[in-house]
Amino acid sequence: LEADDIIACCVRHIQKTQPNRKIYIITNDHDYLQLINSNTTIYNLQNKNLNNKSCGDPKKDLLLKIIVGDKSDNIPKCFKKCGNKTALKLINNPELLQKKLQENPQSKILFERNTQLIDFSYIPHELQEHVLNFISC
């Protein structure tokens, strides 16, 4: 469990239990884009709103990060020579994405691995409960 996982647990808990509460996350890490909603705003350390870096859909932001990887976190791209533009084409055409993953078993393995590493919904429930119990002390 890393710091971003703990923050994600807290944010999701607040979003669920207090849906109208405003949440501000200050970070340079784009992993948090998957948590954006109408009441959750992300600012970088230079006080710039990162919500503008979003695709407009947290699920698409998540898929983009899964496909293009993240060098700073040592997460490789799923496909060689695949940047944001190509990844967005795949995201907007799920059938094509699935076809590409089926054609390239190594890409499929990377996609599944990246999903587990990046997607906050893969945080085991028992760890989420430990985090929430700890912060409620």
Where are these regions (language model features)?
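Extended two-metal-dependent nuclease catalytic cores across DNA- and RNA-processing enzymes
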Residues: L1-S136
